[in-house]
A protein has these predicted regions:
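Ser/Thr/Pro/Gly-biased, low-complexity, turn-/loop-rich segments
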Residues: 2-10, 21, 28-196
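Sec-dependent signal peptide recognition
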Residues: 14-20
């Protein structure tokens, strides 16, 4: 039998062949390739969110010093003061906010307040890593360092990129992130399984 090329096929046959080729090529993209690229972020001043734990030190005032967790509504509950908004603030902005609340309540005339983050919201590393799970966030963490914390890639892992679900302004966004993309607290990182 002699091959006559596409010219020997009826128009319907050519259309089917082109359709099969296109269908085969769509599978070549790899898992997660259709996700939009996650906007690049650089390590910036960290802003607090629910789940973070902070140490507030009011110098000379033992009863107004302690460790506090940012609750789901984004506040910390200070003794004698009540709820103070913390979500979305940096630690220095929280210092100012706590000092203002102490002045407003006539609790301390000229408060000197320090705030430090002692525990960040966790990150979640899922998919093709050796030990998927919840891990503590560390400033400056990238996708590849998060994978390392999760025990490294499995032999089936796509190692060039990952899916990241991130909460921005109260809404979850999902995108594709490179190995060197910075991770933020609360991120859910999924490593895809490679197609062989």
């Amino acid at each position: 039998m002699k091959f006559t090329g596409l010219a020997g096929l009826a128009p319907e046959g050519r259309l089917r062949l082109v359709g099969l080729i296109l269908l085969a090529l769509t599978g070549c993209g790899g898992p997660g390739r259709a996700l939009p690229v996650l906007p690049s972020t650089r390590p910036a001043a960290y802003t607090l969110g629910p789940g973070d734990q902070v140490r507030i030190i009011t110098f000379g005032e033992e009863t107004l010093t302690g460790e506090f967790r940012v609750n789901d509504s984004g506040s910390i509950a200070l003794p004698l003061v009540g709820a103070v908004r913390a979500a979305g603030l940096t630690s220095s902005e929280l210092e100012t906010s706590v000092a203002l609340a102490l002045r407003r309540g006539n609790l301390v005339r000229d408060p000197s307040v320090a705030a430090e983050i002692i525990a960040y919201r966790p990150i979640y590393v899922l998919g093709e890593v050796n030990k998927p799970g919840q891990y503590p966030y560390q400033p400056g963490m990238t996708v590849v360092t998060a994978v390392a914390v999760g025990g490294g890639f499995t032999y089936r892992a796509v190692e060039d990129y990952a899916a990241v679900v991130r909460t921005v302004d109260g809404s979850a966004i999902e995108g594709r992130a490179s190995r060197q993309s910075y991770v933020q607290p609360g991120d859910v990182i999924t490593i895809f399984e490679r197609r062989f």
